Every structure is written in C-alpha cells, then in structure tokens.
C-alpha cells in the first residue's frame, strides 16, 4: 500500500471513529451500573460482576466482531448498507410472496430504528450530565434542564449542517476512547483478577448460579451493544475496511478495558455502583470528564440524527414515506442533509422523553427492545441474501441462521420483560412509523392503479393525435408521468378542456433505481414515439435528489434540447375522497389523505421553476 493510500486510510478510519462508534462508545456510561444496580435481585457480588463482564465481552466479540463486521457487512448495495438496503438485496431473487414478507421484515426493522432514535439522544446526554451528581450532589435538579439545553442547541444547529463541527468529531471521539482505555487500565491495575472474566466459563457460571434471574438480566447486558446497527448503516460513508480497522484497533480494546476497569472498581468498592464510570476517574478529573462525556454523547446523538435523516430520505425515494423537504447542507458531501420536519418532530419527542423519564436509569428500561428486534430481523435478511444472492450452501446458511438466532432471540426475549416499565415507548413509536410507511405505500399503489385502470393505450392515443391533430401552439410541453406506458392525467385533461397541444410534447418519468447512485451515462433514456412526441425516462438512485433542470441538460447533450423558460410543465393534482370501504380501511384512507395534503408538491420535489408549472386538478376516489 502506498504512503498516500495509508494516510487516506488513517484519515477515513479516524473519521469512522468519530461518527460510527458514537452510540456504542458511550454505552460504558450506564451499562454496568444498570447490570448491577440491584434490580435483578442481586447486588455487587463477585460472581455477578464476573458474569456480567464475561457476557459483555463475548457479546462484543460474537455480535459486533463476528456477526456485523464479518458477516452482515458483506451484504452491500454498491457499497451502501442499512436495514432497507438489506431488505432490497434480500428481495431481488425471490418470489412475489417472499418479497412481500421480506419487505414487511425490512419495514419493521426501519420502524424499530425510529423508535430507538428517540431514546438514544435522551439516555446518552442524561447519563453524561448525571456526572454532575458526583461532582456537586446539590445540583442534581439541574440535570434535566441542562440536558434539554444541550439537545436544543444540537437540534437547532442541524440546519447549518455538520461540516464545520464534524471535523472535530473524530479527534474528540478518539480522545474519548483513549480516556476510556486509560481509566480502565487504572481500575484493572488495582484489581487484576477481574481479567479472569475474559473466560466464557464465567458467563456459563452466571446462568447456572442465578438461573431464571440471569435470563432477565440479559436485558441490561444488551445496553453494551446499542448502536451496533450504525456500523452497517454507515458503511457507505466510510467503507468496510476503515470501520473494521477502527473497531479492532481502537474501539474494542478501549471498551473492554473500561468495562473491566469498572468491574475491578466495584469489586474493591461496591458503593461505587451509584456511578462506576465517573468514580473510576480521580477526583481532579471529574469536571474534565463531565465535559468530554457530554461532548461524546452529543456526537453520538448527532450520528443518530444524521442516521434518521438518511433513513428517511431512503424511505421517501423508495416510496415508503411521503415526499418532504430535504435540504443539502454541503456542496461537497451528498450525504449531509437536513430534513426540517423530521428534525423538529424528533426534538419534541426527545424532550418529552427526557421530561417524562427524568433519569437515564429509567430510560434504560425502554432501551434494548428495538435494538434486539432489529438484530433478529437483520439475521433473517442477511442469511436470505447469503442463500439467494451469494448462492451459499443452504445447510451452511441454515447453520449460520440458527447460530445467530441462538444469540438474538434470547436477548430479544429478555427485553420483552421491559415492555411495561418503558419498552412500550420504542414499540409504540415503531408501530406508528410502520403504519405510516405501509399506509403510504399501499394507498399510493391503490391510487395509481385506480387512476390508470380505465386508461387507453398511450401508443393508440399518440397515433390518433398525429392523424387528427388538435390546434397546435408554439413551444414545448412536458407532462410528468408516473408510469411509462400510461397516458398522463394532465395530458388528457388539457386536451379535454383546452383542446390544444404544443408543437413538441415530452412525457417525463422520474424513476428510482434499486441502487444508491446512477451513473450519468445511464441517467437519461430518450425514445421518440412520433414526429412530435418523446418519452424521457430519468433514473436516480435513492441517495440522489431528482432535478429536472439536470435531466434536460442531459437531454440536450443527447440531441433533445429544451429551454426551461420556453417549456411548460403540466402536472395533475389529485383531490382525494375516501369511498365506501371497511372501517379500518377508511381509517387508513383518512391517514393517507393527511399524508398527501402535507406532502411536498412535485414542483418543489423535482426543483422545477414554479413559474413554468401548470397544475390540472382531478378528483379521485380511493
């Protein structure tokens, strides 16, 4: 590897540390405290400490190192990852029925992420600022207000992008992990016997010793791997090698050292259970630790917010969410986007959660169920990809799936016990998002099918118009068409009411490909249907934003020139009414009407000059 390549790899690896590992990197703030807080019927006992440390270590090895970094990350769509990408890959070579099943699994996984994303900023920032209770116990009433202030500032700066402050993420998080390692070493040196917990026999002994209670306690151990999905979701930003390199050289050693350092401290001083992370530090370092812990949790929250923006854009482009305003905050990096509606909706939800739960320990009960649910779904989808796409031996795939589920299902089942004490929150949020996504997709399909079910043949209509043309007016008319072989509603209504046709007519279809990006060579396909009719199909990836001016620039390069200020864009605007249907479908229809009314209009969605747009209304019953 050349010197330049090595330097580039180091830079990308450092950047990955700053973004990808924020969530899992701040888990030591609260994980061991929740494991040994006494809620499971046992306190800070030697067997319990060793058992939990062994479970945490082997979860980091089996789930993060083996499952995600070695297996799941093999499944990429042009380098991109994430649960919806995995869903798309899994459904490529399957039957229609199987594809529908896999789509449901993928949407549930995406919905779980929306449920989790509300909790992550709240529990992360709260757990950091709770260090104030160690420094100055009399200021404990300020924890919630300070957490809200920090998160308010974080959400407020989203519209300006993270390009400038993002450059600080990597060095801050690198410093954070080095501090984790140093504090952990300090604790281990005081009680080296804690390293015995590296032996998996202590995890087995934990289950034998504490029996039924040990299974429920798995729900707390899961806190150590929250954020593991980010490794796969952010693969497109950094690549597989930098993410893997960052984990094995910096993140994993730092996490293991810190967890074992906390364990060593608790064996010497069981009273440190009130906050073993901060009490691991010397007194003089508490204030600096509070500051850098807060910065680290803000960065972890930023990574989650950016993740929900990316997931939302992908869902919009794939047709699972209604179009909404997406603002690019960087001219250099297409992945840096801002979605105002999602940003402020998430902010309100996070503030409500902080005010309602007040303490990170209360929120810990709500955390984990969405994470483990997504892990189960990821196992199913990734093994489907291995069998269908990679053509692995079915017995090997079955063995891998059984092995993965032997880990995932107990973790998920253990978290079901949390539903009453807080787990209902991510489940409810996830259910709402699942209903919204399936409603938009299915009702949109019903609407388009109803609009086109009585349509005449496009070829026959064009032939008729060429044979007996109506009055022709100068200029070019562009009719937006959702389907290539269907007569656009706007064209039919223009002929019906205005009884004129432009000299040149272009039927434009904007299509989303099953890929993050589409090369410019494949951007535009032009087909001349008659002397005065053309069909243009423009293809975009789900990480790209369609732009009509760019489309016609590409058309001009291929011989079909259009001047935007001499072109009229005709679009149909549907006024929807809910027809006779069962009560539950009426409710879904009304939800769709609400989503439709608040959706971004096509001219704004496709960046068409508003003074060149003509909308023709039509009423459609759904």
From Swiss-Prot:
InterPro entries: K+_transporter, K_trans_C, K_trans_N, Kup. GO terms for cellular component: plasma membrane. Its main location: membrane. The keyword NADP does not apply. Coiled coil: none annotated. The keyword Signal does not apply. It is a multi-pass membrane protein. It is found in: Cell inner membrane. Disulfide bonds: none annotated. It catalyses: K(+)(in) + H(+)(in) = K(+)(out) + H(+)(out). Responsible for the low-affinity transport of potassium into the cell. Likely operates as a K(+):H(+) symporter. This is Low affinity potassium transport system protein Kup. The gene is kup.
């Amino acid at each position: 590897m050349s010197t330049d390549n090595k330097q580039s790899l180091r830079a990308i690896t450092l950047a990955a540390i700053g973004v990808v590992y924020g969530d899992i990197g701040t888990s030591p703030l609260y994980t061991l405290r929740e494991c040994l807080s006494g809620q499971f019927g046992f306190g800070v006992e030697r067997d319990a400490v060793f058992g939990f440390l062994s479970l945490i270590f082997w979860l980091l090895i089996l789930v993060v190192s083996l499952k995600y970094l070695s297996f799941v990350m093999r499944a990429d769509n042009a380098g991109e990852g994430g649960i919806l990408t995995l869903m798309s890959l899994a459904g490529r070579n399957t039957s229609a029925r199987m594809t529908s099943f896999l789509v449901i699994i993928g949407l549930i996984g995406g919905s779980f992420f929306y449920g989790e994303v509300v909790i992550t900023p709240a529990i992360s920032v709260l757990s950091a600022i709770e260090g104030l209770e160690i420094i100055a116990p009399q200021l404990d009433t300020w924890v919630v207000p300070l957490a809200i202030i920090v998160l308010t500032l974080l959400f407020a700066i989203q519209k300006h992008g993270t390009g400038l402050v993002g450059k600080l993420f990597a060095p801050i998080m690198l410093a954070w992990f080095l501090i984790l390692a140093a504090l952990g070493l300090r604790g281990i040196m005081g009680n080296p016997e804690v390293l015995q917990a590296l032996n998996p026999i202590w995890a087995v002994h934990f289950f034998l010793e504490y029996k039924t209670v040990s299974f429920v306690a798995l729900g707390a151990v899961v806190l150590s791997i929250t954020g593991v999905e980010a490794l796969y979701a952010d693969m497109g930003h950094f690549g597989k090698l930098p993410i893997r390199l960052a984990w094995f050289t910096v993140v994993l050693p730092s996490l293991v050292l810190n967890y074992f350092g906390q364990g060593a401290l608790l064996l010497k001083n069981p009273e440190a259970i009130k906050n073993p992370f901060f009490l691991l530090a010397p007194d003089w370092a508490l204030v600096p630790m509070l500051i850098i812990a807060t910065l680290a949790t803000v960065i972890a929250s930023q990574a989650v917010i950016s993740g929900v923006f990316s997931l939302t854009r992908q869902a919009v482009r794939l047709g699972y969410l209604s179009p909404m305003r997406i603002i690019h905050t960087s001219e250099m990096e297409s992945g840096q986007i801002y979605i105002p509606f999602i940003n402020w909706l998430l902010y309100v939800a996070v503030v409500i959660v902080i005010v309602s739960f007040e303490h990170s320990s209360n929120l810990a009960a709500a955390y984990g169920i969405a994470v483990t649910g997504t892990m189960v779904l990821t196992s199913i989808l990734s093994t489907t990809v291995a069998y269908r796409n990679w053509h692995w031996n079915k017995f090997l795939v079955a063995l891998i799936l059984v092995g993965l589920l032997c880990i995932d299902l107990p973790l998920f089942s253990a978290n079901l016990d949390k539903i009453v004490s807080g787990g209902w929150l991510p489940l409810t949020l996830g259910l709402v998002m699942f209903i919204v996504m399936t409603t938009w997709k299915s009702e949109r399909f019903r609407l388009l099918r109803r609009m086109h079910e009585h349509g005449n043949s496009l070829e026959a209509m064009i032939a008729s118009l060429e044979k007996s043309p109506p009055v022709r007016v100068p200029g070019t008319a562009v009719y937006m068409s959702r389907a290539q072989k269907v007569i656009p509603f706007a064209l039919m209504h223009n002929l019906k009411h205005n009884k004129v046709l432009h000299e040149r007519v272009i039927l434009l279809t904007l299509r989303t490909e099953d890929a993050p990006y589409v090369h410019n060579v494949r951007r535009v396909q032009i087909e001349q249907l008659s002397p005065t009719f053309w069909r243009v199909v423009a293809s975009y990836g789900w990480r790209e934003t369609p732009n009509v001016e760019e489309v016609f620039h590409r058309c001009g390069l291929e011989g079909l020139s259009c001047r935007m200020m001499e072109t009229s864009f005709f679009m149909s605007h549907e006024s929807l009414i809910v027809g006779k249907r069962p009560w539950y479908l009426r409710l879904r229809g009304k939800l769709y009407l609400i989503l439709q009314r608040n959706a971004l209009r096509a001219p704004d969605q496709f960046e068409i000059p508003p003074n060149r747009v003509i909308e023709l209304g039509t009423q459609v019953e759904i």
